[in-house]
Amino acid sequence: MFDGRNSGHSSFSSRGDGMHTPEHELAGHAAPSTRRGKQNRRSDMEVMKERFAKLLLGEDMSGGGTGETSALALSNAITKLADSMFGEQMKLQPMYPETKENWRKEMGWLLSVIDHIVQFVPSRQMGKNGQFTEIMVTKQRDDLLTNIPALRKLDSVLLETLDNFKDQKDFWYVPRDMEDADHNGDWRRDENWWLPVVKVPTDGLSEESRRWLQNQKDSVAQVLKAATAINAHVLSEMHVPENYIDSLPKNGKTSLGDFLYKSITEESFDPDYFVSFLDLSTEHKVLDLKNRIEASMVIWKRKMCQKEKDGKSQWGSTVSLEKRELFEVRAETILVMLKQQFPGIPQSSLEVSKIKNNKDVGQAILESYSRVLESLASKIMSRIEDVLEADRLVQRQLMGEAETRSESEAESEYEETEKVVAAETPNSRKLSDFIGWRLSSDTKKHSSMSDIEFFHKVEQEKEKPMMKSPRALPKKFSYLAKLENMRSPSDRH
Amino acid sequence: MESSSNSDQNEGTPTSSVSSPYRRTYSDISGLSHRFDVQSFYNRPSNTNAVVLSGHEEDVSEDAEEPKDDVVNDVHGDGDEEDSDIDSAEDAELEMMRERFAKLLLGEDMSGSGKGVCTAVTVSNSITNLYATVFGQSLRLQPLSTEKKDLWKREMNCFMSICDYIVEVIPRSLGTNVEITETKLRSDILMSLPALRKLDNMLMEILDSFTENEFWYVERGSSSMNSGGGGRDSGTFRKVVVQRKDEKWWLPVPCVPAEGLSEEERKHLRHKRDCASQIHKAALAINDSTLNDMDIPDSYLTTLPKSGKASVGDVIYKQLCTAEKFYPDQLLDILKITSEHEALELADKVEASLVTWRRKTGGLTHSKSSWDMMKDISGDADRGNDKNHILAARARSLLFCLKQRYPELSQTSLDICKIQFNRDVGKAVLESYSRVLEGLAYNVVSWIDDVLYVDRTVRNRDD
């Protein structure tokens, strides 16, 4: 029995080897072109052996087989590698060359696993007699074929952005203790206590510099959007683990709590009005809300599937099928809004559970790689935002000192600036994010209903521009700053 | 009298089959299309003295070489090595190792969806498959080709390097009041892996020693065999081709000069045979030890019948029960086992009974390892009167005797089950490595015995 089994594996493996050709070697994937000494080469070999050996053991040093699956081991390895490479990146400056080289090399090793994840597809081959014959050839799995090059590209863009800050003179950093000594007081938020303080010239940034920084920020924002979209898509593709389902209460009402359940199940439902009444004062509360909503969505989905499967009469249920579907759409709408408003929120229980129980190696790599790029992009955006904020502070001081300007004129100009910022950023982000999110929706019907909700929300937004902006901005800054900690499933730490 | 006795003993050995890992290469061997060089054979100079025939040895493995190996070969062929060549070779090595590791992580599942086998089984299968790739077409007493040897060393180093990171944490005292913990290589790996490496090297050296042989090989079915036979009658040729037994139809036929081998060659062959035999015993011991240390899988336990008697059958059960003293050798003689297949069937039954009786005594808790089981049997002298204890002890001695009598027995059902369900990576490496070395050593012994057999046949015929 064992012999036969081995034979099968052997022949299958051999055939796969023969057919597969690595087609997706990218520049970052190749060996370093510069010649290096024998010493370094041997060191590469030893480091790679250690990395892979520990992956194979699933991080279980005893070798007893109680370690994690390959999928989870790879996911953790990518997360830890990113943390060790970027954890110390607190300034807008290029990475150290050695650090960058290590990142490319070790990610190259980890990503090389996907070169061997393939599927068989039919292909036509010209025989010797001129006749076509259909044979099976190997091709890289579709989701990897699409997303890995994209993630590699996003990776390059982020590193290039940091490289762009080489030799810049417009701003600089001083350690926090020096800053405290100068001012005898801290105007910075407490959340950033460990960051060095960014300084700009006493007359502020030049208009050119300001424009250039904004340009860099926009570029990184695009990367963040793309990485977030890929991460969300991969997570949605992962199976909901059985142990997560087993831990759920029996109905959505229990999960949401009375207040939320009543609000969502009202005849008329206004998501903006609903969100305005929620207590979103701490990260923990937002995460808890996210967990509850996701749990109720899973419960409702499962009940709908069961109902369709059983062929049970609608009238026999407490809540009809259509209503439950409506509730699910509303819950999803709120979830999307939360994710827009708090992009740095830690992963929900469902997401953590999916990652920990996932066994698909390809998905593990896609999810972890997109997540670490998402974190890096957010971090860079925060750093750029710090510089722009320092500049705005100086500008405000300058305006206050100007004798020739009237008080009302200055305030008026400030208000206009605030309006422009408030009007532009939330709108553009929400619009594109919302549309992007829809693409991963399960059914067309959901999309259709969500579109209606979406247009309704836009109308609401136009009517109340002033109410929204003062509340959104401070919280956004607050939570963006928390991205200093690399995002990863909380249970893992 | 004495020579007759030796003849009987040696004739028995060639009838044994090769080890189980080796059998997987049948299909590869049947595909061989190499033919003996007839022209070269006929043109051989005729003289009364023995002539070294190394030129006639064909390296059947050459066609199986992969393009990758050429890079390594080029480097080894260069007398003056340049830095660029070294860099190129080492880059290639790094790349190959990376590919090997990547595939191990996927657990033989190319879809990457996580349906592959666990790491331990993956490593075990990989070592077994590597052995088949490197040694599968090695059917003669001759050195392994450089490419195959390098492939074997490189890939085995890759697999064994995983064991470098399997450790256990132990406390160590730095003084009266200071104690720290440090990591140490796991004890079974620390002991057995260097031993296996040593056995591996010794086997390579034995094969390397067969470079200027007095004997040579012809392929079975070769036209030269018939011609040779005819030639003898006509008096044109003095070489004799001895027909071998059919049991090893796939092996090439060894040939010796008409007057037999020289005493020196004979001595050399016997010495190498003894070495290979010792290696076989050592590898077998390590393999048995590792298998015994593996837990008995639940899936095996659930398939056992309720009584040990049902497994082993009435005849054997009666023998185990009634005899005042139990002599396993005598029982095996009585049973008149005629084939290895029968021996394996008996081993499976006895082993199943052993586990069943052990469970009944309460000594076998959930998935207890066989070692603990063995210790319980020998340790519980006070409960020697218990029937199940006696039965278990006797079953164990019978199984042991059976394995001694048939050293190349295939794996029992329990062995196979343990290997398939094992999750321990270190044990997977030790078990598979010792098993393939065991198979190779046994093959070397068999091949040497074949040559000695032909030699004796030729000399007896002359007398």
From Swiss-Prot, chain A:
Q: What does this protein do?
A: Guanine-nucleotide exchange factor (GEF) that acts as an activator of Rop (Rho of plants) GTPases by promoting the exchange of GDP for GTP.
Q: Which GO terms describe its cellular component?
A: apical plasma membrane
Ranges for the PRONE domain? 35-401
Xref: InterPro entries: PRONE_dom, RopGEF
For region Disordered, the annotated ranges are 1-45, 400-423
Query: What is this protein called in UniProt?
Result: Rop guanine nucleotide exchange factor 10
Q: Which residues form a coiled coil?
A: none
Which ranges are annotated Basic and acidic residues under compositional bias? 17-27
**Gene3D superfamilies, per this entry?**
PRONE domain, subdomain 1, PRONE domain, subdomain 2
Pfam families under this entry? PRONE
Gene that encodes the chain: ROPGEF10
- What is the UniProt domain comment for this protein? The PRONE (plant-specific Rop nucleotide exchanger) domain is responsible for the GEF activity.
The keyword rRNA-binding is assigned to this record: no
Keywords associated with the record: Guanine-nucleotide releasing factor
Task: List the GO molecular function terms.
Answer: guanyl-nucleotide exchange factor activity
Swiss-Prot record, chain B:
Q: Phenotype of the disruptant?
A: No visible phenotype under normal growth conditions, but mutant plant roots have reduced density of secondary wall pits in metaxylem vessels.
Provide the protein's localization.
Cytoplasm; Cell membrane
Fetch the InterPro entries from UniProt. PRONE_dom, RopGEF
One GO cellular component from the entry? cytoplasm
Give the PRONE domain ranges: 84-463
UniProt keyword Membrane, yes or no: yes
List, in alphabetical order, the Gene Ontology terms for molecular function in this entry: guanyl-nucleotide exchange factor activity
Q: Where is this region: Disordered?
A: 1-25, 55-87
Q: Where is the composition biased (Basic and acidic residues)?
A: 69-78
According to its UniProt record, in which tissues is this protein expressed? Expressed in root vascular tissue and trichoblast cell files. Expressed in root metaxylem cell files. Expressed in guard cells of cotyledons, rosette leaves, sepals, petal, stigmas and siliques. Expressed in root metaxylem cell files.
- Its predominant location is cytoplasm
Superkingdom per UniProt:
Eukaryota
**Alphabetical keyword list:** Cell membrane, Cytoplasm, Guanine-nucleotide releasing factor, Membrane, Stress response
A GO biological-process term: plant-type cell wall organization
Task: List, as start-end ranges, the regions of compositional bias called Acidic residues.
Answer: 59-68
GTP-binding among the record's keywords? no
The entry's function note states: Guanine-nucleotide exchange factor (GEF) that acts as an activator of Rop (Rho of plants) GTPases by promoting the exchange of GDP for GTP. In association with ROPGEF1, acts as a specific regulator of ARAC10/ROP11 function in ABA-mediated stomatal closure.
What's in the misc comment field? Plants overexpressing ROPGEF1 or ROPGEF4 are relatively insensitive to ABA-induced stomatal closure and become severely wilted during drought stress. A similar phenotype is observed in plants expressing a constitutively active ARAC10/ROP11.
- Quote the subunit structure annotation: Interacts with ARAC10/ROP11.
Q: What is known of its domains?
A: The PRONE (plant-specific Rop nucleotide exchanger) domain is responsible for the GEF activity.
Q: What is this protein called?
A: Rop guanine nucleotide exchange factor 4
